[in-house]
């Protein structure tokens, strides 16, 4: 039919669609529709609209197929609008069948019904508006679901969207960019591809299936949480993921394990990680993070400005650029901490096990390290900040690389020393000190040096304290005599116990 519009005035009955329907003017169907005898099309041209209300009565059967048939339906308004009314949801009717596939195209597509189901695929070509003027949640179920343009709520309400698919859910446009959705949920099983940029909701975003980023993506929830029950990956191109939540963010499985993200940025009240996170670029966590399992963060750069609760799990930080750990926001309760490369530290960093820093450490603020023992494989630059070491087991301080420019250095546990260790303030070693190489302690112009425990080791020890004091509160060389002792400068020296030196002894102030 061409040249005139088509209007079917129903009263809650069902229109049997057993042929294609087309018009260059508007098509209005005020009935339920049963698709019969094969695949059918409802089309308009010249910008004409298509409206299917589902009927005026209460005996609505929605849009469905004839029982026992596997029919598909195409609704195509071209540049015109498509409206699927509140009583016209895609379903199986009272005694019909689900349609096989449904494709809907239009300049804009309005879906007012709260439920839509097909046995095959849903495809929407054109901007989609969810729901009517009263807040509701729409559930869509299919083998595969595809939105080729934007998805928005009806204006001035916060309608939600649930997508149930065991196959592929592809979203190629922004969600909630014009009118924010209430919530967004995808079920477990299958994959959701986000390829349209931003996703904006008022309440929760819950992704039950695997998420694949096909474009740089920003997920924002004003009041709700954002949760990922399955993996999050890029497609074959590394993508950025920015998350902003007025509540919490949770990752129940790995991020970037199959295809690394370009970057990951988080802002929320808290974030939980149950598996590893891999990016090619920066990971920026301004939110408090909690580990649910042993976790490795790997990427170009890492920033943990919001602090971290290790929940007694191991933490590995493998970043090519220096990782920033800000302990002023609580960075602790970790089992073991391993930092593969360089690190910028400040605040208090607490572990119940070891802390291993494989790269160079730079203090960007006063820093306290607590745990069983610490290892600094490539030295430490204090940048005149204070360093407090509170390790229960022996910790190596190796000045043969760089261990210098520290303000005050205070170690409450046992230490092994070698090389040159330089501070602008005092150096206090509260427990035993063992020399495992020739050692020089330099405290600048006036810093004190004190040893609370014994000092042993068959190596040279030189101390340059300027006008500061040198105090030995326990024996020197009682187990293993020193090779030599050189007290190069000090205002006073106090030795409260015995001194044993194997070779020629030392010289300098106090001797």
Q: Where do the model's predicted regions map?
A:
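Extracellular lectin-like interaction modules
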Residues: 1-511
């Amino acid at each position: 039919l061409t040249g005139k519009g088509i209007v079917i005035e129903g009263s809650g009955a069902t229109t049997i669609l057993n042929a294609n329907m087309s018009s260059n003017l508007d098509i209005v169907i005020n009935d339920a529709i049963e698709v019969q005898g094969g695949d059918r099309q409802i089309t308009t041209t010249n910008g004409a609209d298509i409206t299917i209300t589902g009927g005026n009565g209460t005996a609505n059967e929605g849009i469905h197929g004839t029982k026992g048939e596997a029919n598909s339906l195409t609704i195509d308004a071209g540049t015109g609008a498509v409206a699927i009314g509140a009583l016209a949801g895609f379903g199986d009717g009272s005694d019909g069948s689900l349609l096989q596939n449904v494709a809907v195209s239009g300049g804009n597509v309005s879906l007012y019904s709260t439920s839509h189901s097909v046995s095959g695929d849903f495809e929407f070509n054109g901007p989609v508006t969810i729901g009517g003027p009263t807040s509701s949640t729409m559930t869509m179920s299919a083998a595969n679901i595809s939105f080729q343009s934007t998805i928005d709520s009806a204006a001035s309400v916060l309608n939600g969207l649930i997508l149930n698919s065991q196959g592929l859910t592809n979203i190629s446009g922004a969600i909630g960019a014009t009118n924010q959705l209430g919530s967004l949920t995808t079920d477990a099983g299958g994959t959701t591809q986000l390829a349209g940029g931003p996703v904006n909701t008022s309440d929760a975003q819950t992704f039950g299936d695997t998420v694949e980023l096909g474009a740089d993506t920003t997920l924002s929830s004003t009041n709700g949480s954002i949760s990922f029950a399955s993996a999050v990956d890029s497609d074959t191109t590394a993508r950025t993921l920015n998350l902003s939540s007025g509540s919490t963010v949770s990752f129940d499985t790995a991020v970037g394990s199959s295809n690394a993200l370009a970057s990951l940025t988080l802002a929320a009240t808290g974030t939980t990680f149950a598996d590893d996170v891999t990016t090619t670029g920066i990971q920026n966590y301004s939110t408090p993070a909690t580990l649910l399992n042993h976790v490795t963060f790997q990427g170009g750069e890492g920033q943990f400005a919001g602090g971290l609760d290790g929940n007694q799990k191991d933490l590995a930080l493998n970043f090519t650029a220096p990782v920033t750990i800000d302990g002023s926001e609580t960075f602790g309760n970790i089992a073991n901490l391993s930092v593969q490369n360089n690190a910028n530290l400040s605040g208090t960093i607490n572990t119940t096990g070891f802390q291993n820093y494989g790269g160079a450490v730079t203090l960007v603020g006063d820093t306290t390290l607590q745990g069983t023992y610490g290892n600094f494989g490539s030295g430490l630059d204090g940048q005149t900040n204070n360093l407090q070491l509170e390790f229960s087991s022996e910790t190596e301080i190796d000045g043969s690389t760089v261990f210098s420019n520290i303000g005050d250095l205070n170690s409450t546990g046992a230490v092994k020393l070698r090389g040159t260790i330089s501070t602008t303030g005092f150096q206090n070693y509260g427990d035993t000190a063992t020399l495992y190489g020739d050692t020089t302690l330099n405290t600048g112009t006036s810093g004190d040096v004190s040893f609370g425990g014994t000092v042993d080791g068959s190596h040279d020890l030189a101390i340059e304290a300027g006008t500061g004091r040198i105090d030995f509160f326990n024996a020197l060389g009682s187990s293993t005599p020193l090779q030599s002792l050189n007290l190069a400068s000090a205002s006073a020296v106090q030795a409260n116990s015995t001194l044993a030196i194997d070779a020629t002894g030392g010289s300098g102030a106090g001797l």
